[in-house]
């Protein structure tokens, strides 16, 4: 049996653009992707802090250093530039794996610069 657990998240990212005419996904700065252990095509949940919307999409790589967080396609209707969002990835693991797993958690500022990288400590 496996359970779905938090794998990584980028907390309070600022939406820099919303592109309705793109085929879909979320564009994330390459450096933020690496620090959060996210891969191109990986499924993520998006939680919009401003309006409460919650939806799923997949990751595409943005230009390193631009700090872009852009929602594309239909997801662009659920955000506005300047909105604060949480980007969450999950992974399936056994309960034993979950006891020792430490997800990557990035806290970013208003410019999407990393101000803290941490993990959620788990007992076990």
Swiss-Prot record:
Alphabetical GO CC annotations of the entry are: cytosol
One Pfam family assigned to this protein is Asp_decarbox
Pyruvic acid (Ser) found at: 25
Record's catalysed reaction(s): L-aspartate + H(+) = beta-alanine + CO2
Report the locations given in the UniProt record. Answer: Cytoplasm
Query: Mainly localized where?
Result: cytoplasm
What is its cofactor? pyruvate
Pathway the protein takes part in: Cofactor biosynthesis; (R)-pantothenate biosynthesis; beta-alanine from L-aspartate: step 1/1
* Molecular-function GO terms, alphabetical: aspartate 1-decarboxylase activity
Q: Where does the record place the catalytic residues?
A: 25, 58
The Enzyme Commission number assigned here is 4.1.1.11
* Biological-process GO terms, alphabetical: alanine biosynthetic process; pantothenate biosynthetic process
Is this entry keyworded Thylakoid? no
Recorded family membership: Belongs to the PanD family.
Its subunit composition reads: Heterooctamer of four alpha and four beta subunits.
Q: Which PANTHER family match?
A: ASPARTATE 1-DECARBOXYLASE
Recorded hits in HAMAP family, A to Z, give:
PanD
**Protein name (database record):** Aspartate 1-decarboxylase
């Amino acid at each position: 049996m496996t359970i779905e657990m938090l794998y990584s998240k980028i907390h309070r990212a600022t939406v820099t653009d919303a592109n309705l005419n793109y085929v879909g996904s979320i564009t994330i700065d390459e450096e933020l992707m690496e620090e959060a252990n996210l891969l191109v095509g990986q499924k993520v949940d998006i939680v919009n802090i401003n309006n409460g919307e919650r939806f799923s999409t997949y990751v595409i790589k943005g230009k390193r250093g631009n700090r872009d967080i852009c929602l594309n396609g239909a997801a662009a209707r659920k955000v506005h530039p300047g909105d604060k969002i949480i980007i969450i990835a999950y992974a399936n693991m056994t309960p034993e794996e979950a006891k020792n797993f430490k997800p990557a958690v990035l806290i970013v500022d208003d410019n999407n610069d990393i101000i803290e990288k941490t993990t959620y400590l788990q007992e076990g």
